[in-house]
Amino acid sequence: MTNIRKTHPLIKIINHSFIDLPAPSNISAWWNFGSLLGICLIIQILTGLFLAMHYTSDTMTAFSSVTHICRDVNYGWLIRYMHANGASMFFICLFLHVGRGLYYGSYTYFETWNIGVILLFAVMATAFMGYVLPWGQMSFWGATVITNLLSAIPYIGTTLVEWIWGGFSVDKATLTRFFAFHFILPFIITALVMVHLLFLHETGSNNPSGLISDSDKIPFHPYYTIKDILGILLLILVLMILVLFSPDLLGDPDNYTPANPLNTPPHIKPEWYFLFAYAILRSIPNKLGGVLALVLSILILMLFPILHMSKQRSMMFRPLSQCMFWILVADLFTLTWIGGQPVEYPFIIIGQLASILYFMIILLIMPAISLFENKLLKW
């Protein structure tokens, strides 16, 4: 009898994707983040579904409904904090996953890479809209500030913002539509993930050396299933430590105050995972310029396949590029720190320098270093 795993039309697809998939024999723990992101997405969809059963998307009752979830629903506090901190874990895994792609030259699979960048945008949009839902002070003012950025678009800006708001300010209509979008987007993300995997399995995985590994492949199961399970257990451990010991560590205290359009918080700032982009936005004194820099700070990832000048794919054997990569990482940490600081003397100039350095490293310095390393290869 033929194995059902290899003949059944549906199970066959799963088999080719997760069981009999030929994988390089030398992929390190940096390749675990894809599966971790999948687990994060599942956690977010499940916890989000249970939250949606008790949440009301109305300005009068949204804040109270979140309080009700935390106080009266069985393990509601656990579901709520798993969802909030699950988003942080999602972004940590995302940043590490993208960083791995940059370091090892995975962006040369450009369909997979571009779908990945679109996924990053979709997850960021979902997270932003989710942050608005509890209808605390930071939810309301964050929504006001970020949606207002669209008014910088010439000619149609103001009309566009009012159309998104569903009125002349962030109000009931805005909250309702944000809830609708926040609910539907994760399912769109799931579909995009399948496309992402489809393109990845056309080429097969990259590996740390950046060399073609066709001559040395091993089956995904049991080798990488076991490895992924270890990663998943560690992810859940870190998430549960965060949820059970310090659930509000990454949140903003202002969001425990119900939204009040008449009272602006002293420092409006987004969640930690948006701070680097927020710092780039604030570093340009012009509104339209800031918005363009904000969008380009993420969109620039799509340029990496074009900007790749090296004869080698991975940075494994390129110490100068490695050095520049870690300077870029340090620069992103600096931007994240600046994004959370008030707009005053030392922070403004540090933010501007870090923003200039960010774009310079990617657009000029790294391609130049790659060309120099090519020269070094000619003995």
UniProtKB/Swiss-Prot annotation:
Chain residues that bind heme b b566: H97, H196
Sequence intervals crossing the membrane: 33-53, 77-98, 113-133, 178-198, 226-246, 288-308, 320-340, 347-367
Record text on cofactor binding: Binds 2 heme b groups non-covalently.
Gene Ontology, cellular component aspect: mitochondrial inner membrane; respiratory chain complex III
GO MF terms held by the record: metal ion binding; ubiquinol-cytochrome-c reductase activity
Binding, heme b b562: H83, H182
Recorded topology in the membrane: Multi-pass membrane protein
CDD domains tied to this protein: cytochrome_b_C, Cytochrome_b_N
Residues annotated as binding a ubiquinone: H201
Obligatory cofactor(s): heme b
Subcellular location: Mitochondrion inner membrane
Assembly and binders: The cytochrome bc1 complex contains 11 subunits: 3 respiratory subunits (MT-CYB, CYC1 and UQCRFS1), 2 core proteins (UQCRC1 and UQCRC2) and 6 low-molecular weight proteins (UQCRH/QCR6, UQCRB/QCR7, UQCRQ/QCR8, UQCR10/QCR9, UQCR11/QCR10 and a cleavage product of UQCRFS1). This cytochrome bc1 complex then forms a dimer.
Additional facts recorded: Heme 1 (or BL or b562) is low-potential and absorbs at about 562 nm, and heme 2 (or BH or b566) is high-potential and absorbs at about 566 nm.
PANTHER family for the chain: CYTOCHROME B
Name this polypeptide is given: Cytochrome b
Protein's organism: Neotamias ruficaudus
Gene responsible for this protein: MT-CYB
